[in-house]
């Protein structure tokens, strides 16, 4: 879904005030659900979640955590609900066989790095992860899902967006009141800069929680300087992708923003190719969008891949090690 504009306005906005009673009910029920005890998993679970609806950078964070866990001598597997996919699982994702409409876009990216399991039933998915040889599970999303007991939960926030008007859905972007969500996290991952992000980071530090500051860095070594591009993205905050391209020196001659997890149809592809021909630019998108493109589009679009780099990687590695039993 595309976030409504009033979510980023003050909470006194008329629509926010009208929807606030519903938000209090929704947020309260979600918070009550978060407080329930979860089932014991077959191996430790590290949860990468966020406080709000929509994207915040959870998938790059999950990929980065898997790399740090390997540094610690662990064998991680990813567990995802498979948002946007029709398979309920549990199923091990095979990028050569599965499509985004079956397992979701994020699991396809995760499966390139390690075993990735899609399961609506998280305990069943955890058993499949362990059965595949994993000794630690990185759960992509699931902070508000109590079905599994977690050894460590990290909340990811986008420094440029964060919590909007601070109200629970549908009055705002929060999944539950922030005050009740804090008790379920052991640290914060702050991606990028921004006044809003700094405020939430200060709140985390005031509660004694570590704040792991990070940034998305381009991979692949492509030279974007001076390149005329038509940029499109259907992610949580497409503007961040466009800003990254501009920072790399690309000349964006046209941009198109789609809703997060947008399933690209042939008509979308036809419109994009016509736009690129008209503007004289190369089509470019994100890795997450690329797996949702029609088969005929793959190979005809440049992909900007990014990875998450932490300012204090050693500090995060220490927190991960402390949360896990000795191997």
Curated annotation (Swiss-Prot):
GO terms for biological process: lipid A biosynthetic process; lipopolysaccharide core region biosynthetic process. InterPro entries: LpxK (IPR003758), P-loop_NTPase (IPR027417). Its EC number is 2.7.1.130. It catalyses: a lipid A disaccharide + ATP = a lipid IVA + ADP + H(+). ATP binds at residues 52-59. GO terms for molecular function: ATP binding; tetraacyldisaccharide 4'-kinase activity. Pathway: Glycolipid biosynthesis; lipid IV(A) biosynthesis; lipid IV(A) from (3R)-3-hydroxytetradecanoyl-[acyl-carrier-protein] and UDP-N-acetyl-alpha-D-glucosamine: step 6/6. Pfam families: LpxK (PF02606). Keywords: ATP-binding, Kinase, Lipid A biosynthesis, Lipid biosynthesis, Lipid metabolism, Nucleotide-binding, Transferase. GO terms for cellular component: plasma membrane. PANTHER family: TETRAACYLDISACCHARIDE 4'-KINASE (PTHR42724), TETRAACYLDISACCHARIDE 4'-KINASE, MITOCHONDRIAL-RELATED (PTHR42724:SF1). Belongs to the LpxK family. Transfers the gamma-phosphate of ATP to the 4'-position of a tetraacyldisaccharide 1-phosphate intermediate (termed DS-1-P) to form tetraacyldisaccharide 1,4'-bis-phosphate (lipid IVA). This is Tetraacyldisaccharide 4'-kinase. It comes from Methylorubrum populi (strain ATCC BAA-705 / NCIMB 13946 / BJ001). The lineage of its organism: Bacteria, Pseudomonadati, Pseudomonadota, Alphaproteobacteria, Hyphomicrobiales. The gene is lpxK.
């Amino acid at each position: 879904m595309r976030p409504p504009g009033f979510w980023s306005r003050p909470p006194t906005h008329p629509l926010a005030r009208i929807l606030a009673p519903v938000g209090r009910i929704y947020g309260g029920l979600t918070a009550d659900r978060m407080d329930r005890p979860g089932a014991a998993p077959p191996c430790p679970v590290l949860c990468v979640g966020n406080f709000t609806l929509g994207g915040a950078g959870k998938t790059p964070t999950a990929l980065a955590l898997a790399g740090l866990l390997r540094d610690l001598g662990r064998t991680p597997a990813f567990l995802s609900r498979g948002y946007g996919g029709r398979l309920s699982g549990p199923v091990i994702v095979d990028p050569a066989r599965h499509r985004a409409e079956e397992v979701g876009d994020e699991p396809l990216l995760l499966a390139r790095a390690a075993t990735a399991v899609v399961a609506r039933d998280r305990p069943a998915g955890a058993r499949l992860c362990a059965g595949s040889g994993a000794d630690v599970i990185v759960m992509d999303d699931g902070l508000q899902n109590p079905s599994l007991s977690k050894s460590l939960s990290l909340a990811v926030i986008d420094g440029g967006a964060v919590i909007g008007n601070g109200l629970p859905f549908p009055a705002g972007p929060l999944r539950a009141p922030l005050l009740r969500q804090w008790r379920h996290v052991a640290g914060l991952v702050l991606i990028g800069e921004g006044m809003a992000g700094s405020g939430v980071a200060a709140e985390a530090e005031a509660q004694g929680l570590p704040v792991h500051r990070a940034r998305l860095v381009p991979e692949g070594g492509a030279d974007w300087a001076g390149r005329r591009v038509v940029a499109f993205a259907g992610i949580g905050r497409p503007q961040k992708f466009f800003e990254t391209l501009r920072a790399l020196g690309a000349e964006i001659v046209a941009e198109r923003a789609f809703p997060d997890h947008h399933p690209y149809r042939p008509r979308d592809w036809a419109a994009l190719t016509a736009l690129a021909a008209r503007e004289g630019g190369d089509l470019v998108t994100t890795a997450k969008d690329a797996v949702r493109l029609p088969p005929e589009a793959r190979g005809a679009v440049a992909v900007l891949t990014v990875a998450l780099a932490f300012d204090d990687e050693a500090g995060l590695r220490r927190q991960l090690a402390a949360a896990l039993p000795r191997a």
